[in-house]
Amino acid sequence: MASRAGPRATGSDGSDFQHREKVAGHYKMSASLKNEIKKLIYAHLIIWMLIAAQMCVSHLKLVSKDLVAMPYQWEYPYLLSLVPSLFGLFSFPRNNISYLVISMISTGLFSIGPLIYGTLEMFPMAQQLYRHGKAYRFIFGFSAISVMYLVMVVAVQVHGWQIYYSKKLLDSWFTNTQEKKKK
């Protein structure tokens, strides 16, 4: 062993630390999954702010109806999708399993559910746009159906990955908890 002031111990070249300085795999995985989920939550926050801005602009009549269409019915319950993301963020500091489970279930209910309903709600108008090339709602000159379907595709991917990574994180925390209980 080396001392602060003295010479290095004989037979040691300083590379004998690798067997001692390892972080357990489940801690690495937990940290990386938390990081991925946080990125997805921030992406969800951007989508949420875009939808909220569109709703505010149309309801407050800040611009004409020709520029920003009135919101669809699925957009109102989708605004509640911020709550599951907050539960997910609150679960991270102390590895709170119950908050993460609440986040996963309510993400399906408040995020994926309205998106599925929105797909069904807008399908007849999308069909009309495809068949006849006529759109009646616009967002800054683009067909509102096309814009909202694009937003929905991105949102479904974000929420799907969020649920997937949350499940993997939950499994990681749960196996770690079970190992502690066995000891």
UniProtKB/Swiss-Prot annotation:
Stretches assigned to coiled coil: none
Record has ATP-binding as a keyword: no
Chain's role: Endoplasmic reticulum transmembrane protein involved in vesicle-mediated transport, which is required for neutrophil function.
GO biological process: defense response to fungus; endoplasmic reticulum organization; granulocyte colony-stimulating factor signaling pathway; neutrophil differentiation; neutrophil mediated immunity; neutrophil migration; protein transport; vesicle-mediated transport
Protein source organism: Xenopus laevis (African clawed frog)
GO terms for cellular component: endoplasmic reticulum; endoplasmic reticulum membrane
Membrane topology note: Multi-pass membrane protein
Source species taxonomy: Eukaryota, Metazoa, Chordata, Craniata, Vertebrata
Transmembrane segment boundaries: 40-60, 72-92, 100-120, 138-158
InterPro entries given in the database record: Jagunal (IPR009787)
Pfam families in the cross-refs: Jagunal
Gene: jagn1
Lumenal side: 61-71, 121-137
Topology Cytoplasmic: residue spans: 1-39, 93-99, 159-183
Protein name: Protein jagunal homolog 1
Family listed: Belongs to the jagunal family.
Protein keywords: Endoplasmic reticulum, Immunity, Membrane, Protein transport, Transmembrane, Transmembrane helix, Transport
Cellular compartments annotated: Endoplasmic reticulum membrane
